Every structure is written in C-alpha cells, then in structure tokens.
Regions:
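Conserved core architecture of multi-subunit DNA-directed RNA polymerases
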Residues: 1-926
Length: 926
C-alpha cells in the first residue's frame, strides 16, 4: 500500500468545507457553539452528516506537512531551532543553509526561500537520499500547509460536564490549534513570541499526525485489526493448557482425541444465541408453567416447599438472562449465585430447587442429592452441554502454515476442577460440577477450569506447546457445516500429513513412559511364576485400570492425614520376565510384563494387534516413530480404520501420560553431576590437546565431546536416570548433558571468524577469561532465532505465491517424460513411498510391500522436476501418496517448507553443538 501527500487546499475547495473558528465547544445550556468543533451549523444534526462532514482550521501561516517535517529533522536537526527563532541562517551560493548571526529565521523564511535550498545527497546514506527525492518530487503546496483538516465529530469523544463539556485528546489538539491560529491571525506580538507560537503550532500538527498514525500502524492498529484482520462473532482466544489425566480407564477420559474440553464461560460466549434460547425455554418449562404451584427450596428448613409464584415473567426476562450470562463470563465470584424466585404475598427468600441423583461410574443410582438451591452454574452447565451435543469446534493456532494449523473436535463441557456423575431430568451428566457453597468469592476462580483443553496429540500439527501459546476457538453452528466437520474428522487426512507421515504423535512424557514399559530386561530381572504369568496373559484388556496399574507397578504412601503412612512397595516391575508358552497374538517366547501390558492396552483394545501382532521390543522415540509410520502406511492401504486410529491415540496417550508419574524417573543424583571417572578423563584430554585447544581446533573439540559422552554413557548405563536420554523423550547426551555437565566445546567467534574452545561446562561456572566466549554462544543461538524467523516467514510467502497454482492431474495421468532422478533408497525409505521408478522400461510404484527390495540401491525415479505437462503435475511424476490422501492442490502443501526452516532456526537457540562431517564433493554436484 502506498500513501501520498495531498493538497489540503484542494481538498477544502472540492468538498466545500466550512471553517471552524471558535475553540468553545458548548455554549450555556450545553448547546454546541455555532462556530465550534461540534457545531450543528457546520457538521449538521443527523448521524449521517456528523459522520461524513469534515471541516478545517485556517492556520494563518505556512507549516510543514508533519511527515515532511519529520523527514527534514532527520536530515537537518536544526530546522526545529529555525522555526522557533533560536538560530539564524543564510542560504549560500550552493543553496546550503549556513548558520549566520546576520541571517534570517522562522518558518516563513524557509517557505519564501524553499526553491533556493539544495539538500545535498551523500554516497553512504540511502535513507537520506530517499528523503531528498521525496522533497523534490512533491509540490511546494503539498510540502507546506496553511489549513488543518478537522475530522467529523462522530469520531471524536465528547461528554457533557457541569462546566459545559469535556472531550478526548483529539478535540484538545484542535482547540489548541484554533487558539494558536487566532494569535497568528492578528500577529499582535513580539517576534520571539511569534516564532514560539509558530513552533508550538508545528509541533501540534505533528502531535495530531502521530495520534492518527498510532491508531493505524502495527499489529493493534486499525488497518491490521479491522481491514486486514478478521474479527469473528462468537469467537474466543484462549491459552493452550494441558489436559487432565485422572481417568481410571481410557474410555472415561473427558478430554481425548475426539473431544476438546471447553469451559462453561467460553461456551456462553461461543454459543451465546443458543444458550440464551435454552435458558429462556428452561424458565418457560420449569417456572412459568408452574407459577401457580411450584416446589422451591427453603434455606431455613433445608426442605422443598410448594408456593405460588408472583409474576415470574417480569423477573426472568431477556435482561435477566443477559445479565446472568455476562456476569458468569466476566465475574467468577457470581457463579454460585442462587436463583431466587418471587413468592406471592411473602418476603421470604426462596430459591429454585435443584434435585438430582449421584451416580457411580457405572451409572448405577447411589442416593438422592440433599435438596439445595439451583445456581447459575447448574443452569448454564446443562445449557452448555445441551447446545453443544451436536456441534463441532474449530481450534486454530496462528500462523497457519498448513491444514494442521487448525483442527476440528467435538465438545465436552468442563466446569469445576472436581466433578461427579449426576442424573438430572432423566439425563446423565458424567462430569457434573460440584457446587460448594463454602467456597469464598475471592477463591471462586480457582475452583473452575477456564481454558480450553485438547489432546496433546494435536500439538505437533499446531507447532504449539504449553509456554503461553494461544489458540482461537470457534463453534460451528449450521447442520451442513457440522456434517462437513464430521466428515473431515473421519478422513485419513486428519491423521496423516502430505509427506505421508503420522502427524498425531504423543508428547515427550508419553515416549518415556512407553520406553519404561517396554525396555529390555536384564539378566538379573525376576522371571514370573507360571501362575503369575497366566494371570496377566489371560487378563482382559478392558479390565486394566489405572488403579490396577498403580497397584501393580507403583510405590505408594497414604498422605490423607497430612503425613506419609502405609508405605507400600510395588508388587512387580515392568522388566519382570514372562514366558508365553501358548501363542499370544502370534507371539510365543519370552517377553516382559511391561510389554504385555502395553500391547494389551494400546494394540489389543484399539484393534491394531490384528495388523501388528505382538510387539516384543524396546520402544524408544525412533522405534515408536517407525511403528507410527507403519500405522500411516496401513491406513493409506485401508488396512486400518479411522475408528482404530482414534482408539490407538487415546489408549496410547492414556497409558503414556497418566502412568508417567508412576513408573518413570527423569533424574537421579548420578545424572545431575559429572562422574569422577569422566572428570579424570576430561583433565587428561585437555592436557593432551592443550595446543590444539588454544588454537581453537573444532576437530579436537569434537573428539573430546565424543570421548566424554561415550565414557559417561558407559558409567551411567544402568542408572534409571538415563531413561530420559535413552528413550529419546527429551534432551540428548551430545547436547544437553554435555553442555551442562561435561564440556562446552567449540564456539564460533564471528568477529575473528575462528573457533574458540570453552573447556568449562555450565555446571563448572565461568572463568573470567571465558566470559566473552560464553557470550558468543548466546549470540549464536539468539541471532538465528531472531533473524531466521523473519527470513523463514518471508520465504513461506514467496513459496506460497510461486507454487499456489500447482495442481495434480487426474489419477493415472502420465506426461510421458523420459527424464528421471538417480536416487539411492535409504534404510528409512518412508520419504519415497508410493513414488514411481523406471525399471527395465516399466514404471514400478514403491508401495510398502515393494520398497524394501530397493533399499541401498540406486533407482531412476520420476520427479515433478521433470514433468512436461503444462497444466498440472501428472500422477506418475508426483507418485500415488497425494492421491491416497486426496490432496489435489499440491502447491499449497509446499508452504510447509517455510515451517521446516523456521523450526531449524529455532532449534539453533537450544542446540549450538559444532559437528564435523565428511563431505564427498561428488555428492554436491547434480
């Protein structure tokens, strides 16, 4: 967008604007002054005219346009002193302003001699030269202004006061301008007063310019917020918070992969029209229909009494409903407010009665709830559950780089931090809020969940985490749109990205738990008896509860009385060995108890054991990624259903995240320090390579890194604190552990272009000589994060612009190109699945069943780089992967490359280890 200066005088003449001459806003009696800033004569009396009618103020002098004035001050700082009359100047033969006591001063001096002034360009200042070009390109009447435009009064704040009226900042600016102009009109003042008034007027014009500029610019400005931004009704912004894992079974989780948990307060905003309608119907059904005889709650007797209501329609109005909903959203203290009902011929305070039945998790009736008054929370919770039962929500995190930047979920309503199953009006509410009238108002907010929660498995697609990231939530209203949402949730594309990889992965804690469950046993581990083994083998997967897992693997204590009592050691370990003698899911032989439990919970219950059989291996992050890549492949081949994927994700996350605190160990005393043997080795290596270290040899630093890490891994191999690193859940020995406890290593000094070796680890602290070297490590991390973010963002826009029109041809299409790429298929060939190669003159599709035959071989692969179809990319050049995922607009997928680059730049902030690689020059040539 380009903005030019315009001739103010032309604007006044074309629009026939009237002049504002009085600084007085209101006359006596709050009547607008006829010549003032809110005049009915000048601006009219209708809303339309007061919204569209401009006016002007005659400045009675020449003043710089504020944008020009700012530019000149950056080139010639003393211009301000000329306008204020503090310094005198002459214009020499070259047109340059020179300081001279016998010269002239004031804004009129500059105006009269404007054509004589020559602004010198320089060879080393691009911005200065651009500003000079601007001054030369604009006319004199555009650079200087004699009139100030007054915007319509509709956009200026005005409020009446006892003294006549008070206005906002903008009206004060205009009022001051009129006063300065009246002084300049008469010019009945000393010269120094004239110059100072001119200076005040010029600065005031700049203040008005800055006022509007600040309203328009940057992220919160009107252009971005209202013109370029998108404001959606019934929408909310919320911080991403972790879901709660307290379910005894996976099927009892309130927040799972299919359902997001949205708090009552946000439902009231997101579904406002539906909630209002529900509450109105509730009052009609439960109050208005029984006003002659209604059972209500009497707090004095703690019983229900039958009463005649006194005109309840006049109380429970639309205004009452709006006030209740708005108060609930904005003021947590009112959430347990009781609903008082008007009683005929009585001043007693009686309340609408709530009656329901507590249920256990199997929905069997336990007891009647003691009669209590109904609260705002009761009504709005039931309303929220009812209005969202057939709706979906769309949760988005910006920026959206691909289709996984947002996701669709069904809705569960969350309320208080503690809930219970309740049956009310013949409907079961599994997570009904616990109403506690003993909670003080100031602590009420702590008893409610007021942020949206959703499955951890969506975080990778959103590129989000729990450090304050925010999402936008919108609930879909129409039946047609909800049907589309349901179809999207039940498609393969919801789980698999354009690369063909499984995108719904678990978090770091989940990986560590799965590793602990499945890690390799030691020769010293216990072998379970046949009776114990059969007990676990025959156990039904659906009977494995969290209570059972805690009893089996957990070390527990009773802290209910504030002290630790009844300490109980676990009965079994995850590495206890079981000998399966009768084939179980096709497996026969020795396994561990943890692996058996993992298979039963995750694969048996989800139905994936029919495809995978029994998985009897240690599962770290790499192995788990391989399993989930197989899941993606089988899904594309229709060997795994979408329902099985939902079950797999929920069961995996339930056991991985809820059991984490029971069986995993992240640190031990040994993994929080450097072993003495490693300290000895470090000193020996530093002494041995003293010369190379002083010379900053990165190869030697890399060698020392590897030696120290290798020695540490040997010493701590049996320490359970190493599970964090071995599992691949978080951190790495070669980066986090090394930098923290072992050896900082090579650091690039950008000033010298050479490496410096930092011998101390972070735990060792810093010597005085190492402070500058350590500072360079901070620079190496911060610079790529700051600059790289901007670069990758711009690259994403370029990629999107250049490739957005690229589409795939029809399935089976072939452009017939003879050109191919020579590709060596790696050990992990997932990136080349479903691509076409040419073998003996024929096309072969690299399906999961076939691609293994080509690992390690160089093949001739068809590529979009060589597609000769002018309208699209043909099927044979693109491969079958995109067709299996129904992605025809393939160019839109390319923007993910910018996201990859962004993540790589961000990663440098956390990992600045210098690595040495051998590069074959031939690999660099195409």
């Amino acid at each position: 967008m380009r903005i030019d200066l315009f001739d103010v005088k032309d604007f006044i003449e074309i629009n026939k604007l009237q002049e504002v001459t009085s600084p007085v806003l209101f006359q006596r009696g709050d009547i607008p002054h006829p010549d003032g800033l809110v005049s009915n004569r000048i601006f009219g009396t209708t809303v339309q005219s007061r919204k569209n009618t401009f006016a002007y103020i005659n400045l009675y002098g020449h003043f710089f346009h504020p944008h020009v004035y700012k530019a000149i001050k950056r080139m010639f700082r003393n211009m301000e002193k000329i306008i204020s009359g503090e310094q005198y100047y002459i214009i020499n033969n070259k047109g340059i302003l020179e300081l001279n006591e016998n010269g002239e001063t004031g804004i009129e001096f500059i105006y009269d001699n404007w054509e004589k002034i020559n602004w010198e360009k320089t060879s080393d200042s691009g911005m200065r030269n651009e500003r000079i070009d601007m001054l030369k390109n604009f006319k004199k009447d555009e650079i200087f202004m004699q009139y100030l435009i007054v915007i319509p009064p509709f956009y200026r704040d005005i409020k009446s006061t006892s003294s006549g009226g008070e206005t906002g900042e903008l009206n004060k600016f205009y009022t001051n301008a009129i006063r300065y102009a009246s002084l300049l009109k008469d010019r009945d003042m000393f010269s120094f007063q004239l110059y100072q008034t001119n200076s005040n007027m010029q600065n005031l014009i700049v203040d008005i310019y800055d006022y509007f500029k600040n309203k328009l610019e940057k992220k919160t400005g009107m252009l971005r917020k209202y013109l370029l931004g998108k404001n959606v009704d019934y929408c909310s912004r919320t911080v991403i918070t972790a879901p709660r894992f307290h379910a005894n079974k996976p099927t009892e989780m309130q927040t799972n992969f299919k359902y997001a948990s949205i708090p009552i307060s946000q439902i009231c905003s997101l579904c406002y029209p539906f909630v209002v309608k529900w509450v109105k119907d509730f009052f009609e059904r439960e109050i208005f229909s029984f006003k002659n005889s209604k059972l209500v709650y009497d707090p004095m007797t703690n019983k229900s009494v039958e009463c005649e209501l006194d005109n309840p329609e006049s109380i429970f109005t639309d205004k009452y409903i709006k006030k209740m909903i708005d108060g609930y959203v904005k003021d947590p203290e009112c959430r347990f407010n009781k609903i008082e009902v008007p009683i005929k011929n009585s001043n007693k305070k009686l309340f609408l009665k709530f009656g329901g039945r507590r249920l256990n998790q199997s929905k069997e009736e336990l007891s009647n709830i003691a009669y209590r008054p109904m609260t705002y929370t009761d009504i709005l919770y039931m309303a929220a559950v009812d209005v969202t039962k057939d709706k979906h929500c769309i949760i988005t995190r910006y920026p959206v780089n691909d289709e996984f930047g947002l996701f669709i979920n069904k809705i569960h309503v969350v309320s208080t931090t503690t809930t219970e199953p309740i049956m009310c009006n013949d409907k079961v509410y599994q997570w009904y809020p616990v109403i506690d009238f003993n909670v003080s108002p100031e602590k009420m907010a702590t008893k409610f969940i007021d942020s949206v929660q959703f499955s951890n498995s969506y975080l990778k697609g959103l590129t989000g985490d729990y450090d304050g990231d925010q999402t936008t939530v919108k609930i879909v209203f129409t039946q047609e749109a909800n049907a589309e949402c349901e179809a999207k949730m039940n498609s393969k594309q919801f789980f698999i990205n354009a690369k063909g990889s499984f995108i719904r992965v678990t978090s770091n804690e989940g990986i560590q738990t799965i590793y602990t469950l499945t890690k390799n046993p030691k020769t010293t581990d216990r072998v379970l008896s046949t009776a114990d083994a059969l007990q676990f083998i025959k156990m039904k997967p659906e009977n494995i509860t969290f209570e059972f897992l805690v009893d089996t693997f957990g070390n527990t204590v009773d802290i209910s009385n504030g002290v630790s009592t009844n300490a109980k050691k676990s009965n079994y370990n995850t590495t206890d060995i079981i000998d399966i003698k009768v084939p179980y899911n096709g497996f026969k032989g020795k396994t561990t108890l943890g692996r058996l439990i993992y298979n039963k919970i995750v694969f048996d219950q989800s139905g994936l054991s029919n495809v995978f059989g029994y998985i009897n291996k240690e599962i770290n992050d790499d192995v788990n990624s391989g399993i989930e890549q197989q899941i993606a492949n089988y899904t594309k081949e229709d060997k795994i259903t979408v329902d099985q994927l939902y079950n797999y994700i929920d069961y995996r996350d339930w056991v991985g995240l809820q059991l984490h605190a029971v069986i995993t160990t992240s640190f031990t005393s040994n993994t929080l320090k450097r072993p003495p043997e490693v300290t000895k080795l470090k000193n020996e290596l530093i002494k041995k390579y003293k010369k190379e270290i002083e010379e900053g040899d990165p190869n030697i630093a890399n060698l020392i890194d590897k030696e120290l890490v290798k020695k540490t891994e040997e010493i701590l191999d049996d320490d359970i604190g190493m599970d964090l690193y071995k599992s691949g859940a978080r951190g790495s020995m070669g980066n986090n552990f090394k930098n923290m406890y072992l050896f900082r290593g090579a650091v690039m000094n950008r000033s010298t272009g050479k490496y410096e070796i930092l011998e101390n680890s972070l735990l060792d602290g810093l010597d005085k000589k190492n402070i500058s070297v350590h500072s360079n490590t901070i620079l190496e991390g911060a610079y790529p994060k700051a600059v790289g973010t901007a670069d990758s963002g711009y690259l994403t826009k370029q990629i999107s612009s250049g490739l957005q029109t690229e589409v795939l041809g029809e399935y089976g299409s072939d452009c017939g190109t003879k050109k191919t790429l020579d590709i060596t298929i790696p050990k992990k060939p997932e990136d080349y699945l479903y691509r076409y190669i040419v073998e003996n003159g024929k096309l072969v599709c690299l399906t999961p069943d076939v691609i293994g035959n080509y690992v390690g071989k160089t093949v001739k692969m068809r590529s979009p780089m060589y597609c000769i179809d002018k309208k699209c990319i043909c099927n044979k050049c693109a491969g079958d992967n995109f067709y299996k995922l129904d992605k025809k607009n393939i160019g839109l997928v390319a923007v993910t490359m910018g996201g990859v680059l962004l993540n790589l730049n961000m990663k440098k902030f956390h990992n600045n280890v210098v690595k040495i690689q051998n590069i074959d020059v031939n690999d660099m040539l195409i």
